Amino acid sequence: MRDFSEPVAVPLLSGYEAKYLLSLVRCGEVDVSLDLGVSTSKGFVCNEGVSIDDVRVSRWMLEKAAARPEDVYVVEERFPKLAWFEEKMYRLVAPGWRQPTTVEINGVRMHRTVVVNPMDDARQKVMLLRELGGAEALDICTGLGYTAIALLANGARRVVTVEKDPNIVKMATLNPWSRQLFTEKIERIVADAVDFLRKCGEEFDVVMHDPPSFRVAGELYSTEFYRLLYRVVRRGGVVVHYVGQPGVKRGFALYRGVVERMRKAGFKAVHIPECFCVRAVKV
């Protein structure tokens, strides 16, 4: 069990940003974002490319990036895509121009990106917890940290967030939209969620549980896991469990099994269809 490393500040260019810069007709001063939309700086665009302080983005870089708008590139000589393979394929994705990013694992996105952006998606889930003033909050499966950030922003006194996959941890350190994750009020732990819960007492008022798909991490949808959750949540505490809607076109409803197993573990659980979540209270 260890803490995340610190964030790494590197200039990043999305294909959407490149398309925007290439669309500019006149040379001159322009607002440019090299942190995927978190902020902008004054740059100078011309036929050869764009210059922002001491960073130069050549025209061939812009053209390469613009061909794949959702990809993210590191602005350096080789201009690599922010993606790598380590047993699985990991890729940072820009779902829109200057919008919060998501991460893709083997082609599957870890956030909703249609209708709602990933950051707003996390905020909507956290709103299901209702009152957070002074709460001790647990966030299971950190991902890029948007849920932990939203928990703190909505009034949690302290947030503990747990992530098992070191590649996702690495991606969070590189993602500009994850910077607010790295604060002393958020305790960042790299560990298996089951092992972590076994070491906890009854110490959390609220829990956000946003696991990978059932196919990938079935143990995080089990009765045994929900019993561990029940043990660490204080009486009257709330768990919000994102389940999505896998198999819905085939008539399969994952949430029904989740509700049944959470009730079996002792929770009063209901499905919240508009957020694809199950909300459970320890009674």
Give the positions of each predicted feature.
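S-adenosyl-L-methionine
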Residues: 164-201
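A short glycine-rich, Lys/Arg-flanked "PGG" loop and its adjoining helix->strand segment in the class I
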Residues: 221-235
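Class I S-adenosyl-L-methionine
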Residues: 247-283
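Conserved SAM-binding loop of SAM-dependent methyltransferases across substrates and taxa
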Residues: 144-156
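Conserved class I S-adenosyl-L-methionine
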Residues: 133-143
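Conserved beta-strand signature within the Rossmann-like core of class I S-adenosyl-L-methionine
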Residues: 236-244
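N-terminal auxiliary segments of SAM/dcSAM-dependent transferases
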Residues: 1-96
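Conserved SAM-binding motif I beta-strand of class I
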Residues: 158-163
